[in-house]
Amino acid sequence: MVVTVYLLIVYDVGVERVNRVKSYLRTELHWVQNSVFEGEVTESQFRRIETNLERIIDRERDSVIIYSFRSERAMNRNVLGLEKSPLDVIL
Amino acid sequence: MVVTVYLLIVYDVGVERVNRVKSYLRTELHWVQNSVFEGEVTESQFRRIETNLERIIDRERDSVIIYSFRSERAMNRNVLGLEKSPLDVIL
């Protein structure tokens, strides 16, 4: 059985790097909202995402937080206002 | 024993409402990064936060996602680059 984890990534990066971070993360995870991505990944995918993000960001100026959970069931999601990217449409 | 939940709030709101959302959430939770707040709250605090956010945002244009977890232990946090607001300094 492949072990997976559920990721929630938020980032606050320089405007000159935002597009690169966003287009890269779109290849790995689901865009949820401005600067927020989610998705289920394998351990090796998780490490690859970390390595690739480290290459894109400027460690002195940018901030990326990767929250990881044993599964999506660990979280409840309550949306106020617009649901910019309904996850159930994608999954 | 008071039941608490751990919240992670991300928001994507119109520029004319960002300051109001941010200054309100600063009264309830810890600012973690641009448009990201965290904190442990009681069930009644959780409902108050939802009610107050509903009053501030424009439901047609803005998006707020409230992730809730049974406790902070449900999540692992991995920061790449700058830790804009070291949570351990605040807690």
Swiss-Prot record, chains A, B:
GO terms for molecular function: metal ion binding; RNA endonuclease activity. Its cofactor is Mg(2+). Its EC number is 3.1.-.-. It is an enzyme of class 3 (hydrolase). Disulfide bonds: none annotated. Pfam families: CRISPR_Cas2. Mg(2+) binds at residue 12. Signal peptide: none annotated. Transmembrane segments: none annotated. One of its GO terms (biological process) is maintenance of CRISPR repeat elements. Keywords: Antiviral defense, Endonuclease, Hydrolase, Magnesium, Metal-binding, Nuclease. Belongs to the CRISPR-associated endoribonuclease Cas2 protein family. CRISPR (clustered regularly interspaced short palindromic repeat), is an adaptive immune system that provides protection against mobile genetic elements (viruses, transposable elements and conjugative plasmids). CRISPR clusters contain sequences complementary to antecedent mobile elements and target invading nucleic acids. CRISPR clusters are transcribed and processed into CRISPR RNA (crRNA). Involved in the integration of spacer DNA into the CRISPR cassette. Functions as a ssRNA-specific endoribonuclease. PANTHER family: CRISPR-ASSOCIATED ENDORIBONUCLEASE CAS2. Homodimer, forms a heterotetramer with a Cas1 homodimer. This is CRISPR-associated endoribonuclease Cas2. It comes from Methanothermobacter thermautotrophicus (strain ATCC 29096 / DSM 1053 / JCM 10044 / NBRC 100330 / Delta H). The lineage of its organism: Archaea, Methanobacteriati, Methanobacteriota, Methanomada group, Methanobacteria.
